[in-house]
Amino acid sequence: MNMKAGEKALDGCDHKTAYSYLGAALSLLPNDHWKSHYDLSLRLNFLMAGAANSCCQYDEAEQILRRGLANARSLYDQLPSYLLLSQILRAQGNVDDAYNTCSFVLLQLGETIPESVAPEAAKTLVEDTLKMYEEVYDDDWLERKMEDETMRTVVKFYGAITFLAFLSRSRYTAICFICKAVQLSLQNGACVYTPLSLLQLMGFAMEDKHAANLYHIAKNALSLLERFDVGGDQISGVFMNFYGRIAWHYEPFQVCGDNLRRGFESGLSSGSNLGFHCAFHVIKTAIISGEKLDSLLKEIDYYLHLLKTYKSELMKNALLISRETVSALIDKGEATSIEAKVFNNSSQEPVFFHQAYRAFWSGYTVRCHHYFEKCSQLSGQYVQFNPFVLKFYHGLNSLDVLKKKKSHTTRYKEVVRDAISAMKDAAANSEW
């Protein structure tokens, strides 16, 4: 009865109640329950770990999962625990450990993990995958479902490792993984993880401009969601990828921001802190779209407070960088700054972008140009900001420089021409 009550509480997103009921159920099992009640122990152990994770008891959740892994009789019985373990490690900032966990599972499932992936190889993979999509995508494919459970598991873990590879390895390694996931779906039919895989790929391909119809493919991926029972944690991933990385090329920033907030709330209500990726994109979009700074500062502080409550490091650095920018624009940080500082930042691109953005609005044109140039040099490795936005502000800043300087203007003129060309492309893609 305690287990059923705990499951019902989990279904209703009442994680603390679930934690209490499931803990009571575990305490009532006999000492030899892994031998005498194996299936029950396996299920109850995993549910308890999930409830502990949702209640921010990460150490306890990890301990429970490792106990389940040690007592599980097969790899397939271990798979749910490995996935949840990788999510817990990722939330705590242990990206390498999370990556290694997913890598280990994929190797056990017969997949190969590359040490590195060259840019040219990644480009070819994307082109081949998009070509396969064009050849396969039709009503017949839409009617097919991926029946092989092992294959569905592989697609799921490829989706999990993609973002981890982006953070801890390289963009090109991440592209390799997500191309494999999408190709498996195209060859064997769609599954519940296919929409997110397609959107992850479109997010990378959109930045490389491999095809003009990528937005249409992304919309098709969204429509696939209606065929499957998708959980709140996956909804937050879908919304983050579509509205945070793709849709804002074509749809108003405000629409994207509103839907990203929905993605954040969906993740939070499901007990998953992966929704904080949506929060990062909410703030990024709000800064660029010109929301009121005072309101924006309060929203950032709200997310930072929740991160502290959830004991999570997910997107903390990115939110702190954004907060420094908003604080500097309000009063140069004199009354609005906080003690928390950015640390161990693995990607320099957001730092350079915010330095350039602050300099632009503060009137420091040379400094602004310096940091936008650094952003451009890194854009092939890390792209967290819309390239059109980078070029827009870089172009405006260069125009301001050209008004003041009459010598050494060749580079600034190139930037302006590039920005105008990019804005024409953006206007052609957008209907608003």
Spell out what each predicted region is.
Residues 8, 12, 51, 87-88, ...:
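Residue-level signature for tetratricopeptide repeat
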Residues 12-15, 58, 75, 95, ...:
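TPR-repeat structural position
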Residues 179, 183-189, 202-293, 298-311:
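Hydrophobic, small-residue-rich alpha-helical packing segments that form membrane-like cores
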Residues 1-2, 6, 38-41, 45, ...:
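TPR repeat positional signature
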Residues 12, 55, 92, 168, ...:
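Structural motif corresponding to the intra-repeat A-B loop/turn of tetratricopeptide repeats
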Residues 1-73, 77-88, 97-104, 147-190, ...:
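Extended alpha-helical scaffolding segments used for macromolecular assembly and cargo binding
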Residues 1, 90-176, 212, 287-354, ...:
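Amphipathic helix-loop-helix modules that constitute alpha-helical solenoid scaffolds
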Residues 6-7, 23-33, 65-70, 104-114, ...:
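Amphipathic alpha-helical segments of tetratricopeptide repeats
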